[in-house]
Amino acid sequence: MMAVKNKIKELRVQHKITQVQMAKDLQVTRQTIVAIENNHYNPSLELALKIAHYFDLKMEDIFTLK
């Protein structure tokens, strides 16, 4: 089975956004952001779309199969 990898931490750091701020902006907990960044949790389709919109990127630019 293929796993989903993401670039959320890299993008967040590049944009100088804290986990707390990103969580607040996306209306999720900081723990959710941590889990997604560490590939311990795959976001729902809705949250993945929100994250892509947040960074003004396509989903496939953030999430990839490894």
Segments from the language model and where they lie:
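Short amphipathic helical patch at the helix-1/turn junction of helix-turn-helix
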Residues: 2, 13, 41-42
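Short basic helix-loop element that most often maps to the first helix and adjoining turn
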Residues: 7-25
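Key DNA-contact positions within bacterial/archaeal DNA-binding proteins
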Residues: 20, 31, 60
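Recognition helix of helix-turn-helix/homeodomain-like DNA-binding domains
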Residues: 28-41
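DNA major-groove recognition helix of helix-turn-helix/homeodomain DNA-binding modules
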Residues: 47-61
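Short, charged recognition helix plus adjacent turn
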Residues: 64-66
